[in-house]
Amino acid sequence: MTSSVIAQSVFPYRQLLVGFSGGLDSTVLLHRLMLWREQEPDVQIRAIHVHHGLSSNADHWVAHCESLCKSWHIPLIVERVKLRDEGLGTEAQARKARYLAFEKTLQAGEALVTAQHLDDQCETFLLALKRGSGPAGLSAMPVRTEFAGSQLIRPLLGETRTSLEKWAQDYNLCWIDDESNQDDRYDRNFLRLRVLPLLSERWPHFADATARSAALCAEQESLLDELLTEELASVISTEGRLRIEPLEAMSPVRRAALIRRWLAAHHAQMPSRTMLNRIWEEVALAREDATPRLHLGGFEVRRYKGELWWVKYQPTMIDQIIEWRDPSVTLMLPQGSVCFADGGHIRLPNPDEQVTIRFKACGILHIVGRHGGRKLKKIWQEYNIPPWLRDTTPLLFYGETLIAAAGVFVTKEGWIEKGVQLEWKA
């Protein structure tokens, strides 16, 4: 790959952030970009290395990347991340953390460049096939995709690992080998170490053929997107929720295609056919008085008021009581924060009143703007607060008296003509 070819592959970007693990693939990519920059000095390249903390060698890898980038005069950002168990598996969780770090580091006018190659594409296709994916999943990885308001570019997607090895040998490049790449308990490693060598030995152009199939699937998916764009817009509310009633009159195939695209708009991992059926049967068609939910990664598909909602999963806070010792400063909560701000109708606490944030209230409540008393459940219903927000919305208490619900109501015991408001940042 000549400098002109790599320049064309990232055109029109001349400011690049390169995902740099220190392995063979990203080392070759960074080297080629460095050679291009030597010919065109206005090109700006930064590298980012993500330290996952999964290997005892991780600190050595950082030192290697720092040394190489220093010798090539390329600024290196090292991001240390901690993986949270969200039920995705180690591989998927590491990838998620990595791309969150990329997104955080990417600057305006800069494109993200990563080093996936043809063999990676083949593995991705086979993993999607193993999951029973449709055209969207079998499209595997595009050369370019939208990312964090810019683009993610994969210039090496048409090259084999063998060609990258030859480049590295020709230029005497040094790289690191992650020992976990030899662990065939991981699906991708199993394919790379055991399956693909056999397939390539039997059919030398298997990876190329797989890439063509992935491209054809991507074309079909793109065509479907074009054909369904207007219809999808007609069944999505202005707030991004999916209306159930018009979907009921559609064929299962058409309905599933629209649900998939609604989920894709929320950057959800594409569900299996079984999961799509469950979204429709268990969530959309659940009885009216039910509060159905289906967990997808760190999010949930919920139904409320005849619509499907895509919401971030939040554990219940119902039994928590959090003391607010100094209401003049922001109080950090397990999920967000609260503070007092000017311009509301909440009275400030008296010096002898203990201030707490809670998430449930018992008995009959009297709120401003409503005649008579009612229970909290009834108040939530009147204000159209979705069920999943009812036990996570902060309730302000002075002593044992409910004063206000953040952003929703003030009780008669807490109201004053010129007071403050309770701001909640979730």
Curated annotation (Swiss-Prot):
Keyword tags: ATP-binding, Cytoplasm, Ligase, Nucleotide-binding, tRNA processing
Binding residue positions for ATP: 21-26
Cellular component annotations (GO), alphabetically ordered: cytoplasm
EC number(s) reported in the record: 6.3.4.19
Chief localization: cytoplasm
Domain notes: The N-terminal region contains the highly conserved SGGXDS motif, predicted to be a P-loop motif involved in ATP binding.
Function text: Ligates lysine onto the cytidine present at position 34 of the AUA codon-specific tRNA(Ile) that contains the anticodon CAU, in an ATP-dependent manner. Cytidine is converted to lysidine, thus changing the amino acid specificity of the tRNA from methionine to isoleucine.
Family: Belongs to the tRNA(Ile)-lysidine synthase family.
Record's protein name: tRNA(Ile)-lysidine synthase
UniProt source species: Enterobacter sp. (strain 638)
Source species taxonomy: Bacteria, Pseudomonadati, Pseudomonadota, Gammaproteobacteria, Enterobacterales
